[in-house]
Amino acid sequence: MKLHIIGSSSDGNGYVLEAESSALVIEAGVPLKAVKQALGWNIAKVSGCIITHEHGDHAGRVKEYLQDTVMPICASFGTAEAMASRTEGLRRGLTVVKSGELYELGDFKIIPQRLELIDSDGGHYTHDAAEPFCYQIHHPEMGAVLFATDTYCLPRRFTGLASILIECNYAQDILDRNVALGIVDEKRRDRTVTSHMSLDNCIHELTHKTDLGDVRRIVLIHGSDDNSDPGRFKREVAAATGKTVIVAQAGMTIDFNNKPF
């Protein structure tokens, strides 16, 4: 199993898990051509695409994917409706999946999980989207993987994981400094802290809401161009978790096998 990182920023997000005979595309925020290139132009091996939410950097290319491939494209009902409201005829091509249910896409198994917190005031989403999801993904070559982005926390505790892809978007002190310098305005600051995961929150969620016992690697995704420090993020997450930590960069290919040989 290999993980191809095509894009992992506000410019566009796209990842491919490539097994021996199949592949799974995560997000539709990068050109389809880049996905094809990552797969050596063998787009036919793709079993499906999963989308977390409707924002352009995660789903802006979905029409292109639907028009030029036959892969099923999966999203929540809310995400599908939000995307369809922007593009005529789009809804018919999307596959709606439900939170907590198991689905099979070729050799891959996925369990979507709504990014929602339930409290005394009811439920609320942890990103400013219609119905955002994170996903558990399983394949015999890699074991279980958690993919969670564009959220300030995880919705529950996750166990039995071999790898984790998790957003680490900003550091609070860097964000505060950039606000003071006028690099980031207050409106953007307020949205960032209520829709994205900080370094401190990332460490907290990893150490409190995931069982790290069998985790082989943690990949930090969706870092901010202005408010992150990749080297620092890698050091601090590694120190807190004791795990191998990789900061996602476009063009990377990472060995994602569950076993070393």
Predicted features by range, described:
Residues 1-41, 131-150, 163:
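Conserved beta-strand hairpin/beta-sheet module of binuclear metal-dependent hydrolase folds
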Residues 7-8, 28-30, 54, 78, ...:
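Active-site metal-binding loops of divalent metal-dependent hydrolases
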Residues 17, 27, 53, 73, ...:
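Divalent metal-coordination and catalytic microenvironments
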Residues 31-79:
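Active-site metal-binding motif and surrounding structural segment of the metallo-beta-lactamase
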Residues 55-59, 81-83, 153-156, 171, ...:
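Active-site environment of divalent metal-dependent phosphoester hydrolases
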Residues 60-128:
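Glycine/small-residue-rich loop that forms an oxyanion/phosphate-binding "nest" at active or ligand-binding sites
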Residues 101-167:
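Catalytic core of the metallo-beta-lactamase
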Residues 158-250:
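Cap/insert and terminal regions of metallo-dependent hydrolase folds
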